[in-house]
Amino acid sequence: MTAPLTSTLILNPDELGPDPTLGMDLAVKLGIGHLEIRSAEGANAVTLPRERLEHIRSLADERGLKVAALASPLWKWCRPEARPGRVDTFGFPTQVALEHRLGWVERAIRAAAILGAPTVRIFSHLRVEPELTEQFTGDPLLPQALEVANRSGVRLLLENEPVCTVAHAEPLLEVLHRYHGQGLGLWLDVANLHEVGQATGEVVEYLAPYVGYVHVKDYESNADGSRTFCPAGEGCVPYDEVLPLLHAACPTLPYALETHVRDSPADALHAGAAFLRSTVPGGLA
């Protein structure tokens, strides 16, 4: 009898700090077999030389772990003359000249291949001064990037990031409809969708056919409008409604824990893993 297909639980080692072994060892302890690589050794993974990426891959291999995704910072950028606000890109420059961008795309895809990651996250240009904000739809670099990715056996997934130009459902659907046939999918951050007021059942059902990866983090809203991050399932993001809808559309999605909890990230990851295992229908591998 064939075993039923299940969704996958993923952990990002840099949630515990720059030493990737700490997060990898926690993944093993929690029974998590897949990793998301974003940064390591204090540097963005896309900027690391081949030998350091190979070392990270060997650390994962030694523990029986596979790299499910490279959480790259591609397109979380603007022109050099623009002035972005404070943006967390994990050591990657936010101001990137047009002539350097394809090189970064190619470098990220090579990094994914070295790590054994089948998926690479991208963004959609930072929102800066109106006259300098670039449009993602129609960006000539995107078809080039999709072609390079397809040749390399890697899939590009667009994250809905509020500081970027494509975060709401309408532009997301426009971009995905236009480029889905070329391989583009959705890296859905449910908390980001909730932040822009659109983590509803109707919106999730529209987006679900395009989803290839799910980011899971949670937060509590404070009276002053700020947010306090907390373990998944303990905040205001409506996972109890959203996760069953995503599972119904695709029963084998990867769910990646991204806590942003600074005081006790290991405890938050432990609690988040337990929450997802009890909430995603069909269980998690």
Feature roles, as predicted:
Residues 72-76:
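Short glycine-enriched loops at secondary-structure junctions
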Residues 53-70, 139-149, 239-242:
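Alpha-helix-loop-beta-strand connector modules within alpha/beta enzyme cores
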Residues 2-9, 17-33, 57-64, 78-79, ...:
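Histidine-acidic metal/acid-base catalytic patches
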Residues 14:
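Short, contiguous alpha-helical
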Residues 37-60, 125-130:
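Glycine-rich, proline-tolerant flexible connector loops at the mouths of alpha/beta enzymes
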Residues 45-50, 96, 131-136, 197-199, ...:
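Short, solvent-exposed loop/turn segments at secondary-structure boundaries
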Residues 36, 69-71, 121, 157, ...:
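Conserved beta-strand positions in the central sheet of alpha/beta enzyme cores
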Residues 19-21, 25-29, 62, 78-186, ...:
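Active-site acidic/histidine proton-transfer and metal-coordination neighborhood
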